[in-house]
Amino acid sequence: IVNNSFGAVKVANVSIEAAQGWSLAAFGDKATLAHEKVNSNKFGFSLALGNGEKKLTDNKNTSKQTLLDSAVEGCFMSGVGDTSANSIGISYDAIVTPVSEAVTNTAIASVLFIIAWDAV
């Protein structure tokens, strides 16, 4: 994420919503989902912003989950003119249950990032 504004911003919220018949599951050891029924269409997701802590899906809600509900370390960006701090990297990973045939060109989830001004 790159902040090209003249003010500081932060990632204030991140949520994920399952789509197209897929369900959210806990992200963890791949072996956990590998033992699920074939074509059960479950996936776990992990996300980290900047050098911040990984946020993981869990088993509490299979359709939509909030991964981040307030800005934490790694979520803050300065404005234009400070190239050392006006962007953050995003790293992510996913695990899925076995499928009987390849799944291609299918959006199984959407991830929503809410960016807000960082009022100092």
Where are these regions (language model features)?
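C-terminal, structured domain-capping segment
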Residues: 2-10, 66-120
